[in-house]
Curated annotation (Swiss-Prot):
Domain Helicase C-terminal intervals: 414-558
Principal place of residence: nucleus
Residues covered by region (Disordered): 1-29, 48-138, 560-708
Higher taxonomy: Eukaryota, Viridiplantae, Streptophyta, Embryophyta, Tracheophyta
CDD domains noted in UniProt: SF2_C_DEAD (cd18787), WW (cd00201)
Stated name of the protein: DEAD-box ATP-dependent RNA helicase 14
Family matches, as InterPro entries: DEAD/DEAH_box_helicase_dom, Helicase_ATP-bd, Helicase_C-like, P-loop_NTPase, RNA-helicase_DEAD-box_CS, RNA_helicase_DEAD_Q_motif, WW_dom, WW_dom_sf
Broad enzyme group: hydrolase
GO MF term set: ATP binding; ATP hydrolysis activity; mRNA binding; RNA helicase activity
Domain notes: The Q motif is unique to and characteristic of the DEAD box family of RNA helicases and controls ATP binding and hydrolysis.
GO biological process, one term: rRNA processing
Any Pfam family matching the protein: Helicase_C
Amino acid sequence: MASAAAAAATARGPRYAPPDPTLPKPWRGLIDGNTGYLYFWNPETKAVQYDRPTAPPPSSPPAQQPPERPRNSDPAESQAQAGASRTQNAAPADDRARNDHLNDHFERRTEAAGSHAQNVPFTEQNTRSNPSSQPCSAAGVYPAQNVFSEAASGDRTSPEAYRAKHEITIVGNEAPAPFMTFQSTGFPPEILREVQQAGFSAPTPIQAQSWPIALRNRDIVAVAKTGSGKTLGYLIPGFILLKRLQHNSRDGPTVLVLSPTRELATQIQDEAKKFGRSSRISSVCLYGGAPKGPQLRDLERGADIVVATPGRLNDILEMRRVSLHQVSYLVLDEADRMLDMGFEPQIRKIVKQVQPKRQTLMFTATWPKEVRKIASDLLSNPVQVNIGNTDQLVANKSITQYVDVITPPEKSRRLDQILRSQEPGSKIIIFCSTKRMCDQLARNLARQYGASAIHGDKSQAERDSVLSEFRSGRCPILVATDVAARGLDIKDIRVVVNYDFPTGVEDYVHRIGRTGRAGATGVAYTFFCDQDSKYASDLVKILEGANQSVSQQLRDMVSRGGYGGRSRRWASSDDSYGGRGYDSGYTSRSTDNYNSGYGSQSGNGSSFHSSFHNSNSGNQFGDTSGFQTSFHNSSSNNQTSDNPSFHASSNNDQPGDGLSFHARFYSSSRGSDQSRTNNAGFRDRSRSPPSNRNHEDPGSKAVGVSNW
């Protein structure tokens, strides 16, 4: 009986790989008997690593050796000593018990394997492949710092120098050094293979610093701009946890990722499938706007990972069709956006159904007080990783930004110039403020350039079809509302055009962030009109912060009184842009001169026109005596938001001076008595313009859309 157990242990133990004459001496190849992974062992230095060793150049000085340990020809004993060394190195207090457990495990396996196992080292990957040997927690087994040294991987940059170079700051105790190369991560070979086949040569800064923290079972708050590689920053540690725990996926997911929009959710799902395929990790995506039936069937088959929007997940939880009792790894992606959209109650309701002993990772592009509050409530002693300056909104410096100060009738001609200047087939996103304008532009551009529209009124099937054609290049121009500003992760977008300026510089930064992703460069064009002047000051700060040139026209607009209300965007719910609050959506404001982007505005007749032209949306009420009612969609009318938690984000019911209203708003003409248009083309309209407004000659094309 004892001999049979010893034989079984020997069969499962590591063994020498076939001789490889290309390996530099004295390195030897070894094969893990449990997983079949190939790794390498140096009998002289006792180093163990997964990356293939290379002979050091003759002129290079020898790498600094770790403190001298007694040499022992017994690799198994040296491995136990290495395990003890790992326990003494940089492990936080709550992790030391786990390291002691691993060291005991090494010794037990060495004794059970007999004399054969004493001839080859036992790596940490053996414990990762055997879930029963691990403590029952959500921790991932993290590679020790001395197993994959930076010297072995060819990068001798110090952690401090790497952090300074990439503007990484850490808030919290005992944060491990970043993984500056993929070889230093110790990830399983199949995961490394998927990452390298995807074309990544090195971890992004957020990945480099968040991976070692996540693998130590620490909660994380990661503050980084969009396009920084955060998706893999939380997915890969989740994969490693799944491989270790090996829960029954039919009993519920182990990893839960919450996302603000269905576009972002589906893209996270695509990444999970792509990089988890070789590890046989299953995932399901739950989002609104699509039938529940197929999603419920996918859940019944079992899913290791669930990626969900808060609203749809709450619906399914109320149906009792999914259980979260197994979730031990929770991710809140774009947490600031979820709070901005009013999802905080749904998030808290979901978290109540997740076990308290979990690991929570929060990724956000900004760090306002609302995000700080929910982080303090949901996370336990987190390590905060900041990439860049978190005290102010900054744009990606890889994006070249051009701001054209123009009038609304000039937009169409300028857009045509931009599109003609691009290489054929270049992927371009054009952002508009209204759904109707999206459809209008897409129809006008479709024949010559190939364009499609995406916004909240599109069905999920239509959205999927449009995004599929855009990704494939069959339809290289995408016209979108802000629903696509966050969530779209298409790495080869060349140009972003802000046809209409958004309702705040934070949305501007997220819009242009669709280009210049994953280390690439991009170009952003923005049309900036008089009614956008209230954002001029903040826009100049964004441009200067990204080392972009600022036109004299834009500076003149600032000097004439264009302002952004606050030098920083971290405003409370009663004094941020347009009364916008993270928890309460959009508030109602009452003022004579309307200078904010949202709200219900009440003023007197004398200020009606000036206030109207200083806004993009709102309910405008002038002196109703003798007024007629007109409804228009030139800026934004009757626009419901793309998420159910929003109040109507751009909703205009305009009682005003019916005689001069058309001329006051985006006025231009093709015929002197034409005031109604067909929505199938660009709007042509005419009224007698006031003398103090600038107009194009008759026959010029305007861009507003009428909605009678």
